[in-house]
Structures are given as structure tokens and as C-alpha cells.
């Protein structure tokens, strides 16, 4: 049973706080994740056992926070520094060595000190030789009384200096210093590396191009090696969001790294000098957390997914949570967290908390639920805070949150507002009077953008009936860039108006136009509107233009629930309509802002008959239509299944016989 919880206003006013400043914000990141209890427990188990995880869910539901929180539960293991050394036998195959965390810097420093000492000794030797040559030249010039000998001695010293200073063999000391690829301090937490959107070089490692490849000017191969994110995540967590957007080759490389726990670094560009360099396998023992939306699995490498399933977990995160006391407290904690993280906005008072919770109810799109698309809700919190700061307030109030909702409307809502104004000016839909075959349908835009906020629009639908070109060859013609689901919805609806009108439509062409749908129409939520417009056109019964409607329709005439019903009702209010018909099952899902309450009559409908009774204008034709519908209902017979005979009854009958 659903929990009967008090209104948001009553609940918030009972809280023993003045502002969100009085709310305790947990220090542990895991405890800051809101509404993902089941996913959180699985992620925690995965971290303790070093298992891989796939997190699937809508954007902004806490997938990256769950992944990042895993580092707090990873078993304590010794972090390692990774160094790359030159290979005297094969310069293009540098050697790899791992040492305990913090030791890598010491080793590199020791090699640098050794190289500097050898460099100083070499410099002293060179200077000694040069001075000796010059001194011998001066002595020879004095003995032989020839000044030119001094000139030749200086020239010889100069050539000798250049030969010794730039000799590749002598310069080899610098080339022998190893490079530190991955460095840690002894007390560091396990690394968390976000590799979302990383290219191949950043993900798998790369070898930089060397423009000077010969003549003693080249950079040693090991100094050009760069660690990839898979190596930086060694002994930690590698997080990749939108895993399906990675190239198949990169996904295959990650699979290899998961299997072998090491992966060599090579040049990623075949046109680079680094393409010829490949290191020894570099350790990359990481926990992979792959995340994505619901379509991520479709384009994910099957072998990679199989590997994760075999050695880890697949988790679908929640999009909403129950609207109860515990979860409301979590939402208040979320507001406090956002204020603490931002550090630039004031805390929220009780009136502002009420508005945020109501917005969470509204964005969930379902009764007795709260949205978990908290990234977008956090955006509302920050905008409200900015408004309060601009007005030099010390706390955020309800007025600031309401202003934020108007100021930070999604792009689709801003476009829809302008579209409604244009449609009103040019009268592409009407808000009063009655017209045959014309219905004010309702639709949403932004449903395919990944945003949690739907934007409602009025969708005029016009139907007209004409004689078919050929006898018995009537067609249903729908225009307006309909998608596949919308086209199928038109065919399904045809069963309804064939049944209700009782007329042979084989000699009719039924034209259905979705007015002004330049961006196209998809979905079946206009089914009720289509049926009403067509029945109106066939029966010549006007439709009340102050009524809007939405709802899907079964082939038997039942009105089925649809999405975005609150946004659609708001669109009807903004358009100035008086009534809106919604599916009965969606009626309790509607949550309106205070400025929209009591501005429109909301009528729930269970069947198409309920819709027609409200939408069609009273007339003799309407009475005839409903008499016909009544006869159809009375003529329907319900066959009850016979109860099968029990063994006892059968035996009794046999005995009686």
C-alpha cells in the first residue's frame, strides 16, 4: 500500500531547523549519494571485493558519485610507482619497473644526482684538456717565436671542446635517467581516474613524436613515453561514462587490460616516430566502472560486457524514489550538500525547501514519487542561490526558487512559449467556439533530449472526410512528419472510430493533419485527439475549442496513460483553454504550481465515450451517436468461464447414474 504522507508544507514546518545550515552533511562521499540505496550496496560490495561494475541509468542520477565513492571501500593495498628505464639492447623497447609508492621519486633523484655528478666531472676534464692545449700552444709559440701557434692552439681547443661536448657517447648520462610514469605518496588513497571522453592516447598511453630522430639530437625513447589513464588507475578505480561512445578498438584494449592486468604503451599514431616504440607491459590492475544511459548496452563491446558480468555486477540506478519521510529528509540533505559544494550561495529557508521538494515531485512525473535527476535539480538550487545573492539576501526564500524556475527554463520551454504566442497571433488553434473535425491535442517537446523537464505544447489536429477516388478503396492519410509509433497509433485508432460511427468507411478518404509540426510527431499520446477529430468529421458534430486533451487509446476504446501529463496541462493553461481531458490513470500524477492551480478544469477519462461526452458540443447528432454507443455496449456479451467439475462431483454423478 502507498504511504499516506502529509503535505509538503506541513512536513517541512515540523522540521527542527531554521535553514539548511542546520542540516548535517556527511563527510563520506558514499553517504552523500541520494536515493540509490540498492545500487550503493552493490557498489560497496564490488569495491570490497575489487569487482567491476556497469551502472545504467538516466543522466544526473548519481552514477559518477557512486563510482567515485568506491575508492573509500577498496581494500588497503600497497600503491605502486611505475618507472620506465632505457633499454640498452633495444632502445625502442623501454623497460618497466614498479616500486612502492614514494620510492619512484627517490630513484629518479638518485639517477639525476649521478648524471649531474658525471656531467661536472666531464666538464672539468674538458676544461683541463682545453687549458692544456692552449698552454702548450703558448709555450710552443714562445720557444719557436711564432705567434701563429697560439692561434692554432686556440682553434684546436675549440674543435676539441665541440667534439667532446656534443659527443653522443659522452651525452649518454642524461639518457640513462629513468622517467617516472605514475607517482604516489605513501599515504595516498587509491586513485580515481575519470576517463570519460578520453582519446586513445590519453586512455591507453602514448609515445610522443620526436622531430629529431638522428644525429645525436634525438630524445631517448623512454623519455617520450606517457602513461595512459588505465595505468594511472593502477590499484584504483577507472571510471568511463558513456562507455558505448568509445571506439571498438579502445573497448577491446580495455578488455585486454582487464584480463592481463597489464598493457604495453605504444605510439597511437602510425605517422608518429613513437609508432616504432613499445614498452614492456605496464601494470594496470584497476576496477572498471562503466556507466551509460539505457542505450549504452546496445553499442557496448559484447566481450567487454561479458567480462564485466562474469567478474562483477550490472546495476540499473533509480530514476525516482518514494515520497516518504525518509526520502524527503534525504532531499533536504541534498539541498544542504549543494550549498556546501557551491560555497557561493546562501542556505535555504523552510519556504524555499518546500518549493524544491514540490519541484522534485513534479519532475518525477508520477504520484507519490520524488525525482532522482538531482543534477538538474541542483541547477535550480544554484540559480535560486544566485538570485538571492544578487538581491543581497542572507537566505534563499520561496520567491527566489519560483523566480529561478522562470529564469532558468529549459530551451524547449522558451521555444514553446514563443511558439504559443505565434500560434495565437495567426490563430493556428482556437480557444473558444466550436469547429467540426478540429481538436486541441497536447504534446511534449524535449522528451528525447535526456532532460527530466518536459515542455508541453498545444498540438492542433484537424480531420476531414472526403469520398474515395475509387469505390471501396478508402484510405486513412495522416500528415505532419509522423514517426513510426505515431503512424501505428493512427492505425490503432481507426478501429475505434469504425466501431463507434458504425459507418462503412471503405468509400471514404480520412485526412488527418497535425498542424505546425515541422519538427515531427512521435508517440501515441495523440490517439484520443485523433479519434475525437475523425469522429467529429464523420458525424458532423462540432468540437468544443476550449477543451484540450491527451491520452493513448487501445483498439477497444480504453484511454491509456501517457507521459509528461503535468507539462501538457500547464501548456493548456498557458494557451488559455478552459478544460483539459487526461487519462484517469494519470489524474493523480498531475502536480501544478501554485500560480496554475484552479485555472483549468481537469477531467479524467476512462474510455473514449468519456472524452466524446465532454469534447463534442451538444446536438441532435451527438445524441444519435451516444444512442448508437449505448446499443453497442448493451449488445456486448460477457462470457463467464464454467467452473470445472471437481473429482468429488464427478464421483457423485457416476454413483447417481
UniProtKB/Swiss-Prot annotation:
InterPro entries: AAA+_ATPase (IPR003593), Lon_arc (IPR004663), Lon_proteolytic (IPR008269), Lon_Prtase (IPR027065), LonB_AAA-LID (IPR046843), Mg_chelatse_chII-like_cat_dom (IPR000523), P-loop_NTPase (IPR027417), Ribosomal_Su5_D2-typ_SF (IPR020568). Residues 145 are extracellular. The chain crosses the membrane at residues 124-144, 146-166. GO terms for biological process: protein catabolic process; proteolysis; regulation of DNA-templated transcription. Keywords: ATP-binding, Cell membrane, Hydrolase, Membrane, Nucleotide-binding, Protease, Serine protease, Transmembrane, Transmembrane helix. Residues 433-618 form the Lon proteolytic domain. It is found in: Cell membrane. Its EC number is 3.4.21.-. Changing residue 568 to A: Abolishes peptidase activity, but retains ATPase activity. One of its GO terms (cellular component) is plasma membrane. The active site is at 525, 568. SUPFAM superfamilies: P-loop containing nucleoside triphosphate hydrolases, Ribosomal protein S5 domain 2-like. Its main location: membrane. GO terms for molecular function: ATP binding; ATP hydrolysis activity; ATP-dependent peptidase activity; serine-type endopeptidase activity. Residues 1-123, 167-657 are cytoplasmic. ATP binds at residues 57-64. It is a multi-pass membrane protein. PROSITE patterns: LON_PROTEOLYTIC. It holds the Pfam family Mg_chelatase. Gene3D superfamilies: 1.10.8.60, 3.30.230.10, P-loop containing nucleotide triphosphate hydrolases. Changing residue 63 to A: Completely abolishes ATPase activity and makes peptidase activity independent on ATP stimulus. ATP-dependent serine protease that mediates the selective degradation of mutant and abnormal proteins as well as certain short-lived regulatory proteins. Degrades polypeptides processively. Homohexamer. Organized in a ring with a central cavity. Belongs to the peptidase S16 family. Archaeal LonB subfamily. This is Archaeal Lon protease. It comes from Thermoplasma acidophilum (strain ATCC 25905 / DSM 1728 / JCM 9062 / NBRC 15155 / AMRC-C165).
Amino acid at each position: 500500500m502507498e504511504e499516506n504522507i502529509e503535505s509538503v508544507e506541513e512536513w517541512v514546518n515540523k522540521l527542527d531547523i531554521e535553514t539548511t545550515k542546520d542540516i548535517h552533511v556527511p563527510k563520506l562521499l558514499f553517504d552523500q549519494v541520494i536515493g540509490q540505496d540498492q545500487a550503493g550496496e552493490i557498489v560497496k560490495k564490488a569495491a570490497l571485493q575489487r569487482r567491476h561494475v556497469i551502472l545504467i541509468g538516466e543522466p544526473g542520477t548519481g552514477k559518477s558519485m557512486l563510482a567515485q565513492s568506491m575508492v573509500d571501500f577498496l581494500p588497503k593495498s600497497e600503491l605502486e610507482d611505475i618507472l620506465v628505464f632505457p633499454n640498452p639492447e633495444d632502445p625502442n623497447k623501454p623497460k618497466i619497473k614498479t616500486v612502492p609508492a614514494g620510492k619512484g621519486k627517490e630513484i629518479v633523484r638518485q639517477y639525476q644526482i649521478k648524471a649531474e655528478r658525471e656531467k661536472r666531472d666531464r666538464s672539468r676534464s674538458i676544461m683541463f684538456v682545453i687549458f692544456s692545449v692552449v698552454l702548450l700552444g703558448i709555450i710552443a709559440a714562445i720557444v719557436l717565436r711564432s705567434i701563429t701557434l697560439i692561434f692554432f692552439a686556440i682553434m684546436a681547443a675549440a674543435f676539441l671542446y665541440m667534439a667532446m661536448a656534443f659527443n653522443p657517447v659522452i651525452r649518454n648520462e642524461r639518457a640513462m635517467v629513468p622517467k617516472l610514469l605514475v607517482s604516489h605518496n605513501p599515504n595516498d588513497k587509491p586513485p580515481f581516474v575519470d576517463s570519460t571522453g578520453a582519446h586513445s592516447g590519453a586512455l591507453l598511453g602514448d609515445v610522443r613524436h620526436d622531430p629529431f630522430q638522428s644525429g645525436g639530437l634525438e630524445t631517448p625513447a623512454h623519455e617520450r613515453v606517457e602513461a595512459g589513464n588505465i595505468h594511472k588507475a593502477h590499484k584504483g578505480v577507472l571510471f568511463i561514462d558513456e562507455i558505448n561512445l568509445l571506439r571498438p578498438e579502445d573497448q577491446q584494449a580495455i578488455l585486454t587490460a582487464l584480463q592481463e592486468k597489464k598493457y604495453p604503451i605504444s605510439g597511437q599514431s602510425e605517422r608518429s616516430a613513437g609508432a616504432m616504440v613499445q614498452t614492456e607491459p605496464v601494470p594496470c590492475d584497476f576496477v572498471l566502472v562503466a556507466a551509460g544511459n539505457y542505450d549504452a548496452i546496445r553499442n557496448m563491446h559484447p566481450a567487454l560486457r561479458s567480462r564485466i558480468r562474469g567478474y562483477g555486477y550490472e546495476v540499473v540506478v533509480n530514476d525516482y524514489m518514494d515520497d516518504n519521510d525518509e526520502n524527503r529528509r534525504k532531499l533536504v540533505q541534498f539541498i544542504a550538500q549543494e550549498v556546501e559544494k557551491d560555497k557561493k550561495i546562501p542556505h535555504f529557508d523552510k519556504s524555499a525547501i518546500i518549493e524544491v521538494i514540490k519541484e522534485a515531485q513534479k519532475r518525477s512525473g508520477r504520484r507519490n514519487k520524488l525525482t532522482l535527476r538531482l543534477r538538474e535539480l541542483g541547477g535550480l538550487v544554484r540559480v535560486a542561490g544566485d538570485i538571492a545573492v544578487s538581491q543581497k539576501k542572507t537566505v534563499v526564500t520561496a520567491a527566489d526558487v519560483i523566480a529561478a524556475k522562470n529564469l532558468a527554463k529549459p530551451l524547449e520551454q522558451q521555444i514553446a512559449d514563443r511558439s504559443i504566442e505565434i500560434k495565437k497571433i495567426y490563430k493556428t488553434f482556437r480557444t473558444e467556439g466550436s469547429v467540426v473535425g478540429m481538436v486541441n491535442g497536447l504534446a511534449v517537446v524535449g522528451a528525447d533530449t535526456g532532460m527530466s523537464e518536459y515542455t508541453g505544447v498545444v498540438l492542433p489536429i484537424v480531420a476531414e472526410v472526403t469520398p474515395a477516388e475509387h469505390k471501396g478503396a478508402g484510405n486513412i492519410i495522416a500528415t505532419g512528419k509522423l514517426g513510426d509509433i505515431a503512424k501505428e497509433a493512427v492505425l490503432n485508432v481507426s478501429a475505434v472510430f469504425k466501431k463507434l460511427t458504425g459507418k462503412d468507411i471503405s468509400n471514404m478518404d480520412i485526412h488527418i493533419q497535425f498542424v505546425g509540426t515541422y519538427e515531427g510527431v512521435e508517440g501515441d499520446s495523440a490517439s484520443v485527439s485523433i479519434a475525437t477529430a475523425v469522429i467529429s468529421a464523420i458525424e458532423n458534430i462540432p468540437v468544443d475549442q476550449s477543451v484540450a486533451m491527451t491520452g493513448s487509446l487501445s483498439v477497444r476504446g480504453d484511454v491509456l496513460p501517457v507521459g509528461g501529463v503535468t507539462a501538457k496541462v500547464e501548456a493548456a493553461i498557458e494557451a488559455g483553454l478552459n478544460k483539459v481531458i487526461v487519462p484517469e490513470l494519470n489524474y493523480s500524477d498531475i502536480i501544478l504550481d501554485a500560480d496554475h492551480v484552479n485555472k483549468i478544469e481537469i477531467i479524467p477519462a476512462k474510455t473514449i465515450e468519456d472524452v466524446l461526452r465532454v469534447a463534442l458540443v451538444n446536438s441532435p447528432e451527438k445524441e444519435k451517436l451516444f444512442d448508437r454507443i449505448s446499443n453497442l455496449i448493451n449488445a456486448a456479451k460477457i462470457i463467464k468461464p464454467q467452473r470445472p467439475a471437481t473429482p468429488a462431483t464427478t464421483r457423485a454423478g457416476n454413483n447417481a447414474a
